[in-house]
Amino acid sequence: MEKMMPGMVKEEWPPSSPEEGEAPRPMEGLHEVGPPPFLTKTFDLVADPATDGVVSWGRAGSSFVVWDPHVFAAVFLPRFFKHNNFSSFVRQLNTYGFRKIDPDRWEFANDGFLRGQRHLLKMIKRRRPLSYLPGSQQALGTCLEVGQFGLDEEIDRLKRDKNILLAEVVKLRHKQQSTKANMRAMEERLQHAEQKQVQMMGFLARAMQNPDFFHQLIHQQDKMKGLEDTFSKKRTRSIDIVPFLNPGEVSQGDQLESTLLFDPRPFAELNDEPAKSELENLALNIQGLGKGKQDVNRTRNQPRNQASNETELTDDFWEELLNEGARDDAGIPGMERRRPRYVDALAQKLGYLSNSSQK
């Protein structure tokens, strides 16, 4: 340490410039916050010409496009971001305000992410989560939640309407099934009627080709009328002769009379089966008279409904009826063997030209 001589005064030179006398200041931009590393890495990755086949700038330079997401996730994400999840990269872009501008490809844009303008990256701010919102914004969110009560009522009303519509659909479906069942039953009845009509037309055609059939028919009707007269006389005679019985006793004649008096034909309309036409009844009566050469009493005691069920108007029935008529023709005197011309014309119109004897 230097000792000052007596009488000597230390002189201080003034600063050469006014800046040297001011307090020191930090370097310009020292406290400025730079862009996040995620944005800088993404900018460098997009701007690198070596990666244009995988990721590059858009045509206008205001967006970037990921052309191959698989290669981008497998090669570049582990190198720059230490992971290989492309969905995580997209979510990270969303947190910084990037938006997807093309639905057909992975093209993203941001107002601060432009080609050749790296300094604009500091303008891009990360979105804050909802937990960091100020009190006023949280209050606004609460108000919005309170306003959703009206939407809940609307949703409940729509659910009720949906349930009503579903019940209506189920009801209509049941009606549709019942309608289909009725239509199927109607189709079966129509087919049965058409089949019966075809059989009747065939019977008529074959009958018209046989000129002796009508003479046989008249002869059979006369037989039937005689049998009915005989049967009615016997019934009247049994009613006139009534034996004396004690109270509560029933004679065999009464039992037989009750069986004979009960005729189910007036109740045929109450059955589900369709009533037979006059021609069918006539054919059945002719067939019954042909077989009436057997025991008459056994036929009388047999129930009517059983006889009707056993006799069906099938093709075999008509064939047997005509063959039986042809056999009975030998015993009828004065029968013509010639076929009239109108019979042939009618048979040709009906389309059945084959004779029953040829079959």
Swiss-Prot record:
InterPro entries: HSF_DNA-bd (IPR000232), WH-like_DNA-bd_sf (IPR036388), WH_DNA-bd_sf (IPR036390). Exhibits temperature-dependent phosphorylation. A motif (Nuclear localization signal) lies at residues 233-237. This is Heat stress transcription factor A-2d. Belongs to the HSF family. Class A subfamily. Keywords: Coiled coil, Cytoplasm, DNA-binding, Nucleus, Phosphoprotein, Stress response, Transcription, Transcription regulation. Residues 1-30, 290-314 are annotated as: Disordered. The keyword tRNA processing does not apply. A motif (AHA) lies at residues 315-324. It comes from Oryza sativa subsp. japonica. The lineage of its organism: Eukaryota, Viridiplantae, Streptophyta, Embryophyta, Tracheophyta. Its main location: cytoplasm. One of its GO terms (molecular function) is DNA-binding transcription factor activity.
